[in-house]
Amino acid sequence: MEPFNLKSFKKKMMLNRSTLRRFLTRVETKEPKGIDKVQHQEDVEVWKDMDCLACANCCKTMSPTFTNDDIKRISKHVGMSAQAFRDKYLYFERGDKDWMNKQQPCQFLNLVDNKCSIYEVRPRDCSGFPHHTKKKVLDYTHVYKQNVEYCPATYKLVERMMYRLEGEKLK
């Protein structure tokens, strides 16, 4: 596995973002036959070369949504009341009606080793990220469109699916 370089990922993503998004839009418009099987196969391959601790871009640039159960579990773990936890770390996003981090990078991310200080009790949104196999591809293209910009594993997955299904290679 070669060392991960976040700066080169961001350059590559900027260069290929529109191509990947167009592919995902085509998938939404006309679902390719066998895409879910291809997705599962390529997901296995992608994770052979990915190390989340080498990146942690999701924790540095995105906020998970916190459910009420997440808030109760995490606040208990850090020795705070749920209300004190919300007041200190979260804000309520009125549009989506979600609890989100007030700051990025995440307050629980150790920026030296990219490890989460609450890993055992982290939000459900974090434990499932990047949500590759959560639902069928067609039901989750909107999530791929968002995550492809932040997550190298999602970028690589969409790139590999595009090549397998359409034979198109990125720059």
Model region roles, listed by residue range:
Residues 1-171:
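Short loop/turn segments that flank or connect secondary-structure elements
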